[in-house]
């Protein structure tokens, strides 16, 4: 572990060791991270799990750290987390003793491991219900001071146990760094702000604090599709300011899966725009954009006609007609779907082509033929409307 003058090279994600995942699943996810040129992970240590099973828990963490490192990925473990604090009770000396024993054990086990980039002493000390649901705004400064006193002592513990280690605190807002900046080596802030102007202002404040203190910067959490903080916008501004970043988080799953995550557990991706942004390619938001013309060569006519033909009754003799299989209908529907998706005329989070693949994976006898016909009809109708076809 060695302090760097700049961490602008960091392309990180938040990604936790999970005892419920098989080694094969862990490897799949880390292989995807390596392909995305991720070079660091930030994850939460859990004191309670260590206290329950010291060796077993740290074996899990060590295995995760070394698997990451084998893929060229460093680790930033977080000792403690401020988010669950709903009520503040001054830690007793026994509490502090337990915290110190936990930190000492982690530092002894992992402190000299080349896989460790730095220690994050505490995640978001002031982002919790103790502050956010304070019944009287006049009490907020006192509550902030209580938490400040606690996190500073935590910093002192880690520094005393690892004098040469690299320390940061993952603050929710850049201005929260004023409470610990004298105790850490790296300025760390999180950014879930809602507009480009707000994000730019934060980076300017961060750069000013970095220049004032002579300490490098890191954005250790960012990106959320539910907070007006899209990954591609955030990454564009990160890259413009040459600040290293950690996206929250690698895998779309669990509690946060509906608004966070860049890949699914099977290695498929949520949004190609996120992946493109990670490599410096961004949507065009200036003049000169070209409106797609899905029917320029008449292929929309052909796709719609294919659906009309497959849904029509084709008489072969009196009272008889040619049977159209579900495969025939899906094949015709796919022509409309491919045009709709390629021109981004349908919601890309719920791809119609995914429904086609789900039906094709079913045995013919188990498919809902009426639902497939309705789907094909809807896709052709939608393409007609977009192409202004009567």
Regions found by a protein language model. Name each.
Residues 2-184, 222, 234, 241-245, ...:
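Active-site mouth of glycoside hydrolases
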Residues 11, 213-218:
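Short, surface-exposed connector motifs at secondary-structure boundaries
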Residues 191-196, 250-251:
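Short, acidic/turn-prone active-site loops that include or flank metal/cofactor-
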Residues 195-205:
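Substrate-binding surface in catalytic domains of secreted glycosidases
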Residues 216-302:
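Substrate-binding cleft of secreted/luminal carbohydrate-active enzymes
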Residues 300-310:
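Disulfide-bonded cysteine-rich modules in secreted/extracellular proteins
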Residues 309-372, 377-390:
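Long, low-complexity or tandemly repetitive, helically biased scaffold regions used
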């Amino acid at each position: 572990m060695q302090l760097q003058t700049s961490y602008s090279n960091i392309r990180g994600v938040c990604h936790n060791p999970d005892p419920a995942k098989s080694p094969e699943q862990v490897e799949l996810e880390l292989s995807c991270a390596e392909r995305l040129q991720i070079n660091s992970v930030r994850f939460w240590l859990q004191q309670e799990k260590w206290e329950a099973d010291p060796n077993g828990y740290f074996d899990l963490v060590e295995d995760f750290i070394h698997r990451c490192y084998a893929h060229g990925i460093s680790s930033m473990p977080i000792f403690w987390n401020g988010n669950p604090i709903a009520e503040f009770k001054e830690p007793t000396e026994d509490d502090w003793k337990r915290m110190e024993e936990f930190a000492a054990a982690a530092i002894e086990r992992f402190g000299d491991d080349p896989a460790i980039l730095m220690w994050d002493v505490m995640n978001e000390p002031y982002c919790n219900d103790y502050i956010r649901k304070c019944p009287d705004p006049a009490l907020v400064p006192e509550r902030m001071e209580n938490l400040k006193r606690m996190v500073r002592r935590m910093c002192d513990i880690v520094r005393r146990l690892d004098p040469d280690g690299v320390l940061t605190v993952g603050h929710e807002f850049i201005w929260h760094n004023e409470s610990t900046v004298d105790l850490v080596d790296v300025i760390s802030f999180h950014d879930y702000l809602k507009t480009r102007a707000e994000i730019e202002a934060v980076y300017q404040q961060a750069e000013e604090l970095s220049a004032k203190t002579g300490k490098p910067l890191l954005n250790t959490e960012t990106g959320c599709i539910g907070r007006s903080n899209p990954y591609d916008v955030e990454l564009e501004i990160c890259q413009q300011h040459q600040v290293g970043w950690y996206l929250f988080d690698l895998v779309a799953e669990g509690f946060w899966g509906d608004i966070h995550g860049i890949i699914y557990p099977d290695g498929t991706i949520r949004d190609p725009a996120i992946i493109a942004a990670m490599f410096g390619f961004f949507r065009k938001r200036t003049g000169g954009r070209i409106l797609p013309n899905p029917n320029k060569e008449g292929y929309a006519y052909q796709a719609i006609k294919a659906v009309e033909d497959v849904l029509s009754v084709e008489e072969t003799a009196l009272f008889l007609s040619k049977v159209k299989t579900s495969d025939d209908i899906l094949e015709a529907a796919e022509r409309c779907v491919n045009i709709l998706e390629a021109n981004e005329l349908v919601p890309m989070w719920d791809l119609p082509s995914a429904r086609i693949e789900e039906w094709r994976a079913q045995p013919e006898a188990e498919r809902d033929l009426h639902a497939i016909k309705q789907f094909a009809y809807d896709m052709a109708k939608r393409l007609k409307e977009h192409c202004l076809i009567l």
